[in-house]
Regions:
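Conserved lysine of the Walker
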Residues: 34
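Short phosphate-coordinating micro-motif centered on Lys-Gly-acidic
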Residues: 43, 82-83, 90-138
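Hydrophobic anchor at the beta1->P-loop junction of P-loop NTPases
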Residues: 24-26
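Post-Walker A helix-loop "phosphate-sensing" segment adjacent to the P-loop in P-loop NTPases
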Residues: 43-52, 64-67
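The conserved Walker
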Residues: 30
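Conserved nucleotide-sensing/catalytic segment adjacent to the nucleotide-binding pocket
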Residues: 55, 61-102
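N-terminal pre-Walker A segment at the start of P-loop NTPase domains
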Residues: 1-13
């Protein structure tokens, strides 16, 4: 994407295919656009307030006028999978759509095989450009 609006558009398009039980990790350095991407997803589901990373609360819940919510995790402050399991657990994984910032860095060993991974990389020559790789383990 070339700018914030492109990123939100891509996320909005991606969100059309999400369903209950989907787990998505967003990975990239600080400032790479993870939260901007999540705001694009939120827009698709008519979440009116800006989505911000739950760095200290670990998880935010958003009702989306369906029979399930969206859970937004930021596991940056979680030490490892064991701490995540002790403090949060995996019950959320089946209850709604889970969007997990830093998931591949911190809790990759407890994520289901069907997890969708989104890697975001900054362009070194253009401060506004981002590259997105969306993939799933085989």
């Amino acid at each position: 994407s070339k700018n914030v609006n492109d990123t939100k558009w891509l996320a909005n398009f991606f969100a059309k295919y999400l369903k209950k039980g989907d787990i998505i990790t967003l990975n990239g350095e600080l400032g790479s656009g993870k939260t901007v991407f999540l705001n694009g997803i939120a827009s698709y589901f008519n979440i009116e307030k800006d989505v911000c990373s739950p760095t200290f609360t670990i998880v935010n819940e958003y009702n989306i006028n369906k029979d399930y919510p969206i859970y937004h995790f930021d596991v940056y402050r979680i030490k490892d999978s064991e701490e995540f399991l002790d403090d949060i657990g995996t019950e959320y994984f089946e209850d709604g759509i889970c969007l997990i910032e830093w998931g591949d860095e911190i809790i990759q060993d407890i994520l289901p095989k069907a997890t969708i991974h989104i890697d975001i990389q900054k362009d070194n020559s253009d401060i506004n450009t981002r590259y997105f790789k969306i993939w799933r383990k085989k």
